[in-house]
């Protein structure tokens, strides 16, 4: 394709007509390295590999500057498809975190389903058994001007998740959902998957040592390549425009969970084979960027070149080479293995698991070899259509983006004290951002595989016991508050980390690792890039200062993640949304607790003082229609002490329930603890300071409300004081109403059934 000698305007026009999204300057740099005009297939390969989605060209420098990725428990950091941390000397947890935002806005069902499909492949290709997923979701205002579209997107996304996940046989154990007008035209569908693997059975997504010298086979398994998902990574690296919606539908992949299930079982046989033979293979899923991305990254990661013959691909029709290179056909993996295993591997997939009869055209095919040269070469019909330096293709391109603070001119509102706090409580409990998520997770199979200990909705985090003969469990939580990010991207990032860790601690697990999915607007706009940079700085500071328990000054490592830019439409960008997942390890699952109250007469305690921090709160937004300015901040020593106190108290079996304070503040937190129990509460906030009562009740400053077992209150106070905390006794669990008083005056008295009806119906009504 002509590049050299064309004016910028001519070149840009030529690239767009060909369906290529790169800039003229990027095309020129490719031609300069090659010393010639690139072929059309080469430009398509570079377009995918140099997309924001694949190359991290805007974000990589910021991530490297701030994020802590190492730790004593880290087995594999964020260098491959998933991160790995140790559970004990034998077992490891594998975790990956991705986004599928643009596809889910265009085709909600297919977009969400393929998001799940891609993330579980990332975990499986490390040699792991996939044991759970989580789904942090962000939708538009269900009562706003785009309500019909918002509800259509939300319903489709939820359907896609449960239809794919249930058929695949992987439980959803965690998730959250936020509704806001900023997501009207750009929903966020983030997905997390975790798996378990023995430390000595980990498989890497790279060409193994010696594979180039020995000419290892490159084997493609799964669905026949078609044109589905073509240009998906380019589509994900641009702003959404309504007038282009129909044209973009082809960039959304087509899922098949039944085939995926069969592939996972066949993969287990592959893993068993390589263990028996004592050989190392490379194994990688085909996701964004398709065959080109998977094969070139595996070769480059091993320090080798790669030769691919497209005529050997199993395909679903006649397609030009550029389509075969970058199509994102789902349910595919790539294997790099010794030639002496070729027939055994082909037999596993084509005969033992009979892929051709499971899905028409599916199979395993040898499509190339690893080489010792430094080139990435692709042939089609006997001719070279791609011949480029493999490190140049995979190394991407880097931009030093300009950043400039966004000025919002936010102020604290002067609102009056509500006359009827009962009404305020009921309205907040019914808010779609607080109400029960049962309307969503009732569709999910949360107990498939039989390992789930704590299900969605029962606690702040999910918990599973993936190894039957062992006592340990894996906890998972996902969190982010875009309303905080709107006020302060820095504190939005920091609070997301803190809340994710609090949620894991609330069941008694110790935070072990973090992942991030960073959802922002157009990085070419200085204000948007500043929001990204500030959020990363905030979450990194939280990870560095909250520490791995038992390892002072050691950050909680961030071992996996994703950056999703261009979550923007002509109507505007999403609020800064750094979604954090936290994995915790529970040494003895029999000690885990939930958030529902257990025994009348038990003491209720508050950990964490209340501050005048209602900026971005549900109270301000829902009741008064304002954002505010005083966003919650993370006081790192205080936060660390609260988390450690709860973990230790659960371990000593003196807490019966715990719930972290977040959306809605202390009052909503305490009321939610009644929702899944037959109990009420009687609390008094007289000793919490001199702030106005509504601010004390609804401030979203971090903390916990905990139920302390009768007779164990002194021991709990002693634990808290050992961490320099002064817990406040709020009151006790009762058999009556939800009561909150101050200085002898009853502020709130709710019938638990009335409160439960508001809480259980809010999300159902919003998505009706």
From Swiss-Prot:
GO terms for molecular function: ATP binding; magnesium ion binding; phosphoribosylformylglycinamidine synthase activity. The keyword Chloroplast does not apply. It catalyses: N(2)-formyl-N(1)-(5-phospho-beta-D-ribosyl)glycinamide + L-glutamine + ATP + H2O = 2-formamido-N(1)-(5-O-phospho-beta-D-ribosyl)acetamidine + L-glutamate + ADP + phosphate + H(+). SUPFAM superfamilies: FGAM synthase PurL, linker domain, PurM C-terminal domain-like, PurM N-terminal domain-like. This is Phosphoribosylformylglycinamidine synthase subunit PurL. GO terms for cellular component: cytoplasm. Disulfide bonds: none annotated. HAMAP family: PurL_2. GO terms for biological process: 'de novo' IMP biosynthetic process. Substrate binds at residues 99-102, 121, 253, 328-330, 564. It is found in: Cytoplasm.
